[in-house]
Design a protein with these regions (language model features):
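Short edge beta-strands and adjacent turn/loop segments
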Residues: 24-51, 327
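Phosphate-binding loop that captures ATP/GTP phosphates
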Residues: 142-205, 209-217
Length: 383
């Protein structure tokens, strides 16, 4: 540092930089050793050199804006210039150790004893019920409510979460760690970020399991309050892998009011009985009537499907399963997904937006525990 003859207080500059988080790691630049140099001119002009984890870091512009804004607020600063350099291999190794410790193999933090992250696997028995739309809107609503949220697009074959969240950036990799892109205040990972164009993914079960394991263990999620997983429809390999990798994950079952949809949704929820997972609740999407030109109500998908699923799963599992909410039909829910802008952010007071915010609030406030979990054991009498 070269303070020169100036009234600018270097301690205040360092304090200002301590408020700037790395956009991917979500921790202060000063804590991560990413401030290489601070040069203060007598005129009050300040140059800050920031160390990037990789040369092609996609967050360069964000860092420039955030550092400039923080330093410009210090008394006496007349101008701010942000320069960049790249970490050495040794510095990246130290960063990895700081974030992950000295463990030789990555571990899934959400599966470790003492993890306070609430994990919800969003499932449906069949496609076309709006499961992915529900997932991204719940995630965006929770983030808007102040929670730290991550989303795993676990629908490897039918990935759609990046588009629905408007994510086009590819993840940055640092010493074997994957830094998930961020959008709307949440972190997200998807196989779609690693495939060229709209290329299909043609994998067998073991490859699916490995991909999910990497998304959970190799991605640096930081300290999450909630992790949401958008599962593929049905009860196949991915559902089994999630139960193995994240035994504490709770199932969210999405259905429509339609009879055929809720019958299939019951099968998806009944998987919890075999995997000893808890069912967090049922969400009925595409709910409520629409009206014709004469004002007559039309139940496009019938009614009562969500409650029927909740009641059936309660009987099957022997636990309390509640209908968390009913999300009205709203074309803007689909339009928001196409545009990468969740409805809960654009119109949180709309019928669908308000319903999703209410469901998100219920899930975000739930305490973790063993209530409702089938432990897979049989009590025996004491001898």
């Amino acid at each position: 540092m070269q303070p020169g003859d100036t009234t600018v207080d270097l301690e205040k500059i360092n304090a200002a930089l301590a408020t700037v988080n790395d956009p991917e790691i979500r921790r202060p630049l000063t804590d991560l050793g990413m401030i290489k140099d601070i040069n203060v001119e007598p005129s009050g002009s300040v140059a800050v050199t920031v160390l990037l984890t990789v040369s092609g870091c996609p967050m360069r512009n964000t860092l420039t804006d955030d550092v400039s804004r923080a330093v410009a607020g210090v008394d006496g600063v007349t101008d701010v210039r942000v320069d960049f350099d790249v970490m050495t291999d040794e510095q990246r190794t130290e960063l990895r150790k700081q974030l992950r410790g000295d463990s030789p193999d990555p571990v899934i933090p959400f599966a470790q004893p003492g993890s306070m992250t609430r994990v919800y696997a969003v499932a449906s028995g069949k496609g076309g019920v709006g499961k992915s739309s529900i997932t991204v809107n719940l995630a965006a609503a929770m983030a808007a409510q102040g929670l730290s949220v991550g989303v795993v697009d676990a629908d490897i074959y039918g990935f759609s979460v990046p588009r629905m969240l408007g994510v086009t950036a590819r993840p940055t990799q640092v010493e074997g760690m994957i830094m998930p892109p961020r959008a709307h205040g949440l972190a997200v990972i998807s196989i779609g970020m690693f495939t060229p164009g709209n290329a299909p993914v043609v994998w067998r079960g073991p490859m699916l399991h490995r991909a999910l394991q990497q998304f959970l263990a190799d991605v640096y999620w930081g300290d999450l309050d909630v992790l949401l997983l958008d599962l593929p429809p049905g009860t196949g390999d991915v559902a089994i892998s999630i139960a193995q990798l994240l035994p504490n994950a709770e199932l969210l079952i999405v259905t429509t009011p339609q009879m055929a949809a809720h019958e299939v949704a019951e099968r998806a929820g009944a998987v919890a009985l075999q995997t000893h997972q808890q069912i967090a609740g049922v969400i009925e999407n595409m709910s409520g009537p629409v009206y014709d030109a004469n004002g007559n109500a039309i139940e496009l998908f019938g009614s009562g499907g969500g409650q029927a699923v909740a009641d059936s799963l309660a009987r099957t599992t022997g636990t309390r399963v509640q209908l968390l909410g009913q999300v009205p039909i709203d074309v803007r829910l689909r339009e928001g997904g196409d545009a990468g802008r969740p409805l809960v952010l654009d119109d949180p007071q709309s019928g669908a937006g308000a319903a999703l915010h209410q469901i998100a609030a219920k899930l975000g406030q739930r305490e973790r525990g063993l209530a409702g979990v089938s432990l897979g054991i049989t009590p025996v009498s004491k001898l």
